[in-house]
Swiss-Prot record:
Residues 345-354 are cytoplasmic. Belongs to the LAMP family. Keywords: Cell membrane, Disulfide bond, Endosome, Glycoprotein, Lysosome, Membrane, Repeat, Signal, Transmembrane, Transmembrane helix. Glycans are attached at residues 88, 96, 118, 126, 164, 199, 246, 261, 279. Could play a role in phagocytic activities of tissue macrophages, both in intracellular lysosomal metabolism and extracellular cell-cell and cell-pathogen interactions. Binds to tissue- and organ-specific lectins or selectins, allowing homing of macrophage subsets to particular sites. Rapid recirculation of CD68 from endosomes and lysosomes to the plasma membrane may allow macrophages to crawl over selectin-bearing substrates or other cells. N- and O-glycosylated. Residues 52-61 have a biased composition (Basic residues). This is Macrosialin. The chain crosses the membrane at residues 320-344.
Length: 354
């Protein structure tokens, strides 16, 4: 009987122990939080690459953010923050930012933090924003025109007059062409000729004292003439000249040309007379020459009508004219000798045969 009671008591104790096993205070259910990687939502602009890695440990959140931004040209990259919090999170951010900017640019990077429970998050963000800039052309304007062909008529002979009130002070009549030596794309050198169009040329100038000035402006360039009056020698001459223009020659490596010369003494004529020359070349520099064809110029003591005074020929025309005159005189004398010889041969003899 005693054994039965002991056996029943042991059985009841065993059943009671199994029934309360789930409520054992010493047994604890554990929820394991695995390591995780959080990729925040990032709004990317063109040319921006962002990589963010977040690792979870235990107690305190330390975030190190290194941002390198290189911007060329007007670029704006913005990353809006996204924060989701569950539980207690302690964040100690450390941010190192390096920005190199060439041109106006704005870059804003905000971190994204996600926390679950008591966690320590060490996000490492390496963000690089690169925006290619733009290249401005060295020549923003359209290419200049090709040089005009050599003229075959008198249409390119311009008549340019500058008047101070009602009194003209400079009168220029000529066909103007500019010769330049330019470098070709292959590294060689070549001469190019551009002819001035009178219909597209604007005349300006000044008539101050003994230094009259004439400025001819045309598309893509201008010519400047400065004259000097020598009252002691009673002459006037060209003392200064400058040229600047853009023209596109075949296979040229450049199209902007400029030169000036302030030590000239050309186109000299007596006061009150006009200077005339069939072809006068002015050297502004070894690579820039100005040719004045069929030239007629007067820069002092012009009448109110602006008509040219007595013509004063250039030395080159006089040197050609003198041999021509001498040759014509000799040719005339030879013709007279031949005519006299023919007349004598035709005259009958004064003696008659017996």
């Amino acid at each position: 009987m005693r054994l039965a009671v002991l056996f029943s008591g042991a059985l009841l104790g065993l059943l009671a122990a199994q029934g309360t096993g789930n409520d054992c205070p010493h047994k604890k259910s554990a929820t394991l939080l695995p390591s995780f990687t959080v990729t925040p939502t990032v709004t990317e602009s063109t040319g921006t690459t962002s990589h963010r890695t977040t690792k979870s440990h235990k107690t305190t959140t330390h975030r190190t953010t290194t941002t390198g931004t290189t911007s060329h040209g007007p670029t704006t990259a913005t990353h809006n923050p996204t924060t989701t919090s569950h539980g207690n999170v302690t964040v100690h951010p450390t941010s190192n930012s390096t920005a190199t900017s060439q041109g106006p640019s704005t870059a804003t990077h905000s971190p994204a933090t996600t926390s679950h429970g008591n966690a320590t998050v060490h996000p490492t963000s390496n963000s690089t924003a690169t925006s290619p800039g733009f290249t401005s052309s060295a020549h923003p304007e359209p290419p200049p025109p090709s040089p005009s062909p050599s003229p075959t008529s008198k249409e390119t002979i311009g008549d340019y007059t500058w008047t101070n009130g009602s009194q003209p002070c400079v009168h220029l009549q000529a066909q103007i062409q500019i010769r330049v030596m330019y470098t070709t794309q292959g590294g060689g050198e070549a001469w190019g000729i551009s002819v001035l169009n009178p219909n597209k040329t604007k005349v300006q100038g000044s008539c101050e004292g003994a230094h009259p000035h004439l400025l001819l402006s045309f598309p893509y360039g201008h010519l400047s003439f400065g004259f000097m009056q020598d009252l002691q020698q009673k002459v006037v001459y060209l003392s200064y000249m400058a040229v600047e223009y853009n023209v596109s020659f075949p296979h040229a490596a450049q199209w902007t040309f400029s030169a000036q010369n302030a030590s000239l003494r050309d186109l000299q004529a007596p006061l009150g007379q006009s200077f005339s020359c069939s072809n006068s070349s002015i050297i502004l520099s070894p690579a820039v020459h100005l040719d004045l064809l069929s030239l007629r110029l007067q820069a002092a003591q012009l009448p109110h009508t602006g008509v040219f005074g007595q013509s004063f020929s250039c030395p080159s025309d006089r040197s050609i004219l003198l041999p021509l005159i001498i040759g014509l005189i000799l040719l005339g004398l030879l013709a007279l000798v031949l005519i006299a010889f023919c007349i004598i041969r035709r005259r009958p003899s004064a003696y008659q045969a017996l």
